[in-house]
From Swiss-Prot:
The lineage of its organism: Archaea, Thermoproteota, Thermoprotei, Thermoproteales, Thermoproteaceae. ATP binds at A9, Y10, S11, G12, G13, L14, D15, T16, T17, G117. This is Argininosuccinate synthase. Its EC number is 6.3.4.5. Pfam families: Arginosuc_syn_C, Arginosuc_synth. GO terms for biological process: argininosuccinate metabolic process; L-arginine biosynthetic process; urea cycle. L-citrulline binds at Y87, N123, R127, S174, S183, E259, Y271. Pathway: Amino-acid biosynthesis; L-arginine biosynthesis; L-arginine from L-ornithine and carbamoyl phosphate: step 2/3. HAMAP family: Arg_succ_synth_type1. The gene is argG. One of its GO terms (cellular component) is cytoplasm. Keywords: Amino-acid biosynthesis, Arginine biosynthesis, ATP-binding, Cytoplasm, Ligase, Nucleotide-binding.
Length: 397
């Protein structure tokens, strides 16, 4: 596999720093690095410095936070994007965007290959490779960690031997964070029976240390998307940042589950995602207020889980994803209103909701007053409603 110009998706971590030197040696190629900012808590000036010290010909920093929020996270909110009903798809959403930005740089430079630091056991290799194949099928894809066969200890030794600037040799956890979530893997997390140590968490306080008084938030939605919190209009990215802060301060947003990876095995995954958890529950509740029972069942049990599966499995480019979103958009144009949530010591409750399009009628729901069907109407309804079941039951005796 020949390549003279390689554009590497660069995080600044051990794998991709070693990859800069390895790619240069292996292929005799010029290596360019790209770091895409999707809201991760990194020192980007240090990452750039590290890239050049590792041998990059040129480093590119791309601020994609707004695009990530408005083109990726927004879709996840509309589609209640939770893989297996639990994981808010933070990493899965970011990888196609990062891959697309790497392809853009590769095109600008006239490169003949792109590279990434994913291993052969991870989901991210699929997400990256499939996106590149869709956008630029002519570009070669190189995944050094799938080729070189080095253990982590051997990577550290390689880095030391070549004088590479790596300062994370003894990390306890593997962390991946962005605007939408923070994932925590490795070390004690790999024991599915052990409670995650408190030092694994950064965005959320332990529920027992959260404030003794609850926090109430009123979230306003327009056509399925949040547009204001407590009456203050703001951008989606700002709303997410605010909810991450407020939710985390109340211990809301910790996720611990066994995940079915697309590469064929189960893994124990721990996440922090306060904003994602709050918006998921608030949005679904508003949908229940507005949508008809048939719309609700179709969206919550067909559209939403299918969409989450596609995104998790690296199929952002799958035509079905777009079709699912188009179907949902027809319903979401009515999902406007306000939802009031209560945050308290790690728990979240929706405690109020209203919408000009809500299907709820107090007159119909109130048992103490209002309209009642007549006895004759009730009997006729019950007779027709139960006919299928009762007919089958009688025939099967």
């Amino acid at each position: 596999m020949g390549a003279s110009k390689i554009v590497l998706a660069y995080s600044g971590g051990l794998d991709t720093t070693v990859a800069v030197k390895w790619l240069s040696e292996k292929f005799g190629a010029e290596v360019y690095t790209v770091t895409v900012d999707v809201g991760q808590e990194d020192d980007f000036s240090k990452i750039e410095e590290r890239a050049y010290k590792a041998g990059a010909v040129q480093h590119f920093y791309i601020d994609a936070k707004r695009e990530f929020a408005e083109e990726y996270i927004a879709r996840a909110i509309l589609m209640n994007g939770m893989y297996e009903g639990v994981y808010p798809l933070g990493t899965a959403l970011a990888r196609p965007l990062i891959a697309a930005k790497v392809v853009e740089v590769a095109r600008r430079l006239g490169a003949d290959a792109v590279a990434h630091g994913s291993t052969s056991k991870g989901n991210d290799q699929v997400r990256f490779d499939v996106t590149v194949k869709a956008l630029a099928p002519d570009l070669k894809i190189i995944a050094p960690a799938r080729i070189w066969g080095m253990t982590r200890a051997e990577e550290i030794e390689y880095a030391k031997r070549h004088g590479l600037p790596v300062g994370e040799e003894h990390k306890k956890y593997s962390i991946d964070d962005n605007l939408w979530s923070r994932s925590i893997e490795g070390g004690p997390i790999d024991d599915p029976l052990a409670e995650p140590p408190e030092d694994a968490f950064k965005w959320t306080v332990s529920p027992d240390k959260a404030p003794h008084d609850p926090t109430y938030l009123t979230i306003e939605f327009e056509k399925g998307l949040p547009v204001a919190v407590n009456g203050e209009k703001m951008s989606l990215a700002s709303i997410i940042s605010l909810l991450n802060h407020v939710g985390g301060a109340n211990g809301v947003g910790r996720i611990d589950h066994i995940e079915n990876r697309l590469v064929g095995f189960k893994s124990r995954e721990v996440y922090e995602a306060p904003a994602a958890v709050i918006l998921y529950h608030a949005h679904r509740d508003l949908e229940k207020m507005v949508l008809t029972p048939r719309e609700l069942r179709f969206k919550h049990y067909v559209l939403d889980p299918q969409w989450a599966d596609l995104v998790y499995q690296g199929l952002w480019v799958e035509p079905l994803r777009n079709a699912l979103e188009k179907a949902a958009e027809e319903m979401e144009r009515w999902v406007s209103g306000e939802v009031r949530v209560k945050l308290y010591k790690g728990s979240l409750w929706v405690v109020g909701r209203e919408s000009p399009y809500g299907g709820y009628s107090k007159e119909l729901a109130d048992y103490s007053a209002g309209w009642y069907p007549s006895d004759e109407e009730a009997r006729g309804f019950i007779e027709m409603w139960s006919l299928h079941s009762l007919t089958a039951l009688r025939r099967r005796k």
